[in-house]
Amino acid sequence: MNTIWIAVGALTLLGLVFGAILGYASRRFAVEDDPVVEKIDAILPQSQCGQCGYPGCRPYAEAVGLQGEKINRCAPGGEAVMLKMAELLNVEPQPCDGEEQQAAPVRMLAVIDENNCIGCTKCIQACPVDAIVGATRAMHTVMSDLCTGCNLCVDPCPTHCIELRPVNETPDSWKWDLNTIPVRIIPVEQHA
């Protein structure tokens, strides 16, 4: 019984010593992130599609915040993201020109021709937001609520059964743009 308490005490002491070492190391060797990069990264849609020329949203945010990259390269975010970044960085909004892919004015949605789908799962692997579901050698389908229309699933398809189609706005698919609604703060007097 005495050896059990010695073992418990030794393990507790080791845990405390190593915990203190890890705590010291985490503070001593901590890397501070740039708060501007964090804010830019929060603005981006996090689709990790690579249409901006960077492997994901975080590297693009670092390029904009630290290297002065253009703010109009995010195709899925379009003009709304560009305007938010321009406001954050206090720069002039930049219209999309011929070099950058201009965001489509209509939301695009990937559609799979299920009769020609062979179930190879290449589109599932290419989708950055997991909007395509299906199993090996079974037909796949796109979940329209998750699809960003980034076009990354079209090229890997060996049977070319995926295409992007515009989504027609219906009362069910239309959403309020909350950034355009004017909001006023009305002061309220409190009576004692």
UniProtKB/Swiss-Prot annotation:
Chain sites annotated for binding [4Fe-4S] cluster 1: 49, 52, 57, 74
Main location group: membrane
Gene3D superfamilies per UniProt: 3.30.70.20, Electron transport complex subunit B, putative Fe-S cluster (1.10.15.40)
Keyword Iron-sulfur applies: yes
PANTHER family: ION-TRANSLOCATING OXIDOREDUCTASE COMPLEX SUBUNIT B
Gene: rsxB
Lineage, broadest ranks: Bacteria, Pseudomonadati, Pseudomonadota, Gammaproteobacteria, Enterobacterales
Protein name according to UniProt: Ion-translocating oxidoreductase complex subunit B
4Fe-4S ferredoxin-type domain location: 108-137, 138-167
Domain 4Fe-4S intervals: 32-91
Cofactor annotation: [4Fe-4S] cluster
Residues that, per the record, bind [4Fe-4S] cluster 2: 117, 120, 123, 157
Pfam families cross-referenced by the UniProt entry: Fer4_21 (PF14697), FeS (PF04060)
Keywords: 4Fe-4S, Cell inner membrane, Cell membrane, Electron transport, Iron, Iron-sulfur, Membrane, Metal-binding, Repeat, Translocase, Transport
UniProt-annotated stretches for the region Hydrophobic: 1-26
Positions that bind [4Fe-4S] cluster 3: 127, 147, 150, 153
Co-factor note (free text): Binds 3 [4Fe-4S] clusters.
NCBIfam families membership: PRK05113.1 (NF003475), rnfB (TIGR01944)
Organism whose genome encodes this protein: Salmonella schwarzengrund (strain CVM19633)
GO molecular function annotations of the record: 4 iron, 4 sulfur cluster binding; electron transfer activity; metal ion binding
